[in-house]
From Swiss-Prot:
GO terms for biological process: cardiac atrium morphogenesis; cardiac muscle tissue growth; homotypic cell-cell adhesion; negative regulation of homotypic cell-cell adhesion; positive regulation of fibroblast growth factor production; ventricular trabecula myocardium morphogenesis; wound healing. This is Cerebral cavernous malformations 2 protein-like. It comes from Mus musculus. Residues 184-193, 237-251 have a biased composition (Basic and acidic residues). InterPro entries: Malcavernin, PH-like_dom_sf. Residues 161-193, 214-290 are annotated as: Disordered. Gene3D superfamilies: Pleckstrin-homology domain (PH domain)/Phosphotyrosine-binding domain (PTB) (2.30.29.30). Residues 214-223 have a biased composition (Gly residues).
């Protein structure tokens, strides 16, 4: 009985305790007791904040930010580089109570970047907030509003919020965080890796096993919020509404009888599916050249520590974009107004400025070695001729050759990022090496190899054997003398 009486007084706090220890201090003490894991990150250096593209292709990078809100009613004609437009939009969102007036530690989140997508998760329980596919990114801009350093991401309509605590992705926790005083469960190993290997649409399809498939069979399709219309989801303003997503879904007049969704779904008379271009051969109202007021995009508002952190995040997002669209740039290509996406042309970077600035260490091999490179290797070799020798170095920035005084033979291997070679530099090297009759060919691609013809190999063996015989003759003559 005594235990039951004490249990009933659990929520009581004495007035003296309230005066001496305010609520904010008690919450800070509780937050400090929850340990946070170190981020999966690496140091990057200004002004370019360059990173090895293979890290973004095969791995991911995490940055700590504050998630302020996700606006879904923004027109696609918004200029993300205009400070006045962004400030006016942020003030309107604050008046509508869709953005907070100040930042709190509860807004701490993790921005995880990879070549496939951008992930936003809460810092403490690491529940998934947003998944933004790379092809949906339109622009990333930095904005300073009073003391806040804001990172604004303009994305397309293919971004759906995920209710907190209901992450059912194959690698998400999918569990209830429990009462506030309970200790959080240990994070599963490899969660972020599995989240980065699937896109947003694939995740929603993969999640639909068991209860999800039954819900869709009962007629509840769409995102998770629309399937769970009766439950109240915590988190941002959009996740607390009955219907999340674009502005039309939440403000479509006519109630449940009128289908919400994008402009194409509301304007489709025959009720057939598919994109707008297949049903209407005329001009596209989502074209930025002649856009329609009904075309909308999403804005993700993040707060960072300082200007350097914002510039680093913008640079990383630009590099993520250029990995997929190597011949285009995120600043001049706005994809938020399109429902269709162009096919990635090159999965590798085409600019030499994207290479990591790494100090190269050379290893000299004393014996001849057959030269072959992997996608992440570059080779430097010295080809000796009858009268002189040339050193040809091919790397990510091209091919260069220099005249050497001594006719030595050695091979040097350097581990840097592979890149394509220009035909001009290859032709110059071929012409310069044509003095002794040798020939070679270079090919650009992930499976590139450096091959020498049979004629050049035969002449090279003859020259090496003659050089060895002359060395032995000179050695014998010197010993005899």
């Amino acid at each position: 009985m005594e235990y039951e009486a004490k249990k009933g007084k659990k929520g009581f706090v004495s007035p003296i305790r309230r005066l001496v220890f305010p609520k904010a201090a008690r919450q800070a003490a509780f937050r400090s007791s929850v340990s946070r894991r170190p981020l999966h990150s690496m140091p990057l250096y200004p002004p370019d904040y360059l990173i090895d593209p293979h890290i973004l292709l095969c791995d991911y990078l995490e940055k700590e930010v504050k998630f302020l809100g996700h606006l879904t009613w923004v027109t696609s004609s918004l200029n993300p580089s205009s400070r006045d437009e962004l400030l006016q939009l942020l003030d309107t969102a604050r008046q509508l109570k869709e953005l907070p007036l100040k930042t709190t530690p509860e807004q701490d989140s993790i921005l995880s970047l990879s070549a496939r997508c951008l992930l936003l998760t809460w810092r403490d329980n690491e529940e998934l907030i947003l998944r933004i596919p790379t092809h949906e990114i339109a622009a990333a801009s930095y904005l300073q509003d009073d003391a806040l350093h804001l990172l604004v991401l303009k994305t397309g309509l293919g971004v759906d919020p995920v209710p907190a605590g209901m992450d059912g992705s194959p690698g998400g926790s999918g569990r209830d965080p429990g009462p506030p005083g309970a200790a959080p469960e240990k994070r599963r190993v490899g969660t972020a890796e599995r989240r980065h290997t699937i896109c947003s649409l694939d995740w929603r399809v993969a999640w639909g096993g068991g209860a999800g498939a039954e819900a869709r069979a009962a007629g509840g399709g769409g995102s998770l919020e629309r399937q769970r219309a009766g439950a109240r989801a915590s988190g941002s303003w959009e996740r607390r509404q009955t219907f999340s997503g674009s502005w039309e879904r939440r403000h479509a007049g006519g109630g449940a009888g009128k289908p919400g969704g994008s402009w194409e779904r509301r304007q489709a008379s025959g009720g057939v599916g598919g994109s707008w271009e297949r049903r209407h051969p005329g001009p596209n109202p989502l074209d930025p050249q002649n856009h329609s007021p009904d075309a909308y995009c999403n804005l993700v508002i993040l707060a960072v520590a300082n200007r350097d952190a914002a510039e680093e995040s913008c640079a990383l997002i630009c590099q993520v974009f250029q990995i997929i669209y190597g011949d285009q740039s995120i600043e001049c290509v706005d994809r938020a107004g399109y429902h269709y996406r162009s096919t990635p042309k090159r999965p590798w970077l085409s600019s030499c400025t994207m290479a990591p600035r790494t100090h190269l260490k050379r290893a000299t091999v004393a014996h001849p070695h057959r030269l072959s490179t992997a996608p992440t290797a570059a080779v430097s070799t010295t080809a000796a001729g009858p009268s002189s020798s040339y050193r040809i170095t091919w790397s990510r920035c091209g091919v260069s050759w220099v005249l050497l005084r001594s006719s030595s033979l050695h091979c040097c291997y350097e581990t840097i990022v592979w890149g394509c070679l220009s035909r001009t530099t290859v032709q110059v090297c071929r012409n310069s090496m044509g003095t002794d009759g040798s020939s070679f060919s270079l090919e650009c691609g992930p499976s590139s190899q450096i091959r020498t013809s049979a004629t050049s190999r035969a002449s090279w063996r003859v020259w090496v054997s003659a050089r060895a015989e002359s060395s032995l003759t000179a050695l014998a003559a010197s010993s005899a003398a």
